[in-house]
Amino acid sequence: MSDYRVTLEAGWTVKDVESVQDAIGIAVSEAGKRLHPSAKFVDVDVMNMPCPYCGKEINTALVIARTGLVGLLLSMKVFKAENPEHAVHIAKSVIGRALRDVSLSTYSVELIEGDEIAE
């Protein structure tokens, strides 16, 4: 049995926003509130990707017609999983229970070495 850090990606919709920064702030806040009572150990971050023109890192957020779509990364440590697929299944179950109507997709799975567990 091994320990893993599982990161899932989610597309978060925010209504009635004027700017990308507002959409990001509201998305992170709403996700944090929904995760807090049952899964407060989940880290919430804004997803970044390289700009296709300059290669610089940009956030994955978009606002059209006062509706925002923000790419979020939700990561958690999963202890004593049988394999990476089992760790993903556990993470999706825990996070999915808190964020019922949000689609989740696997972003990354990393094996945690013995020293990193004590963080």
Swiss-Prot record:
Signal peptide interval: none
One Pfam annotation reads DUF555
Membrane-spanning intervals of the chain: none
Q: Which InterPro entries match?
A: UPF0212
Report the domain of life of the source organism: Archaea
Give the UniProt family note.
Answer: Belongs to the UPF0212 family.
Protein's name in the database: UPF0212 protein Mlab_0931
**Which lineage do the record's taxonomy fields give for this organism?**
Archaea, Methanobacteriati, Methanobacteriota, Stenosarchaea group, Methanomicrobia
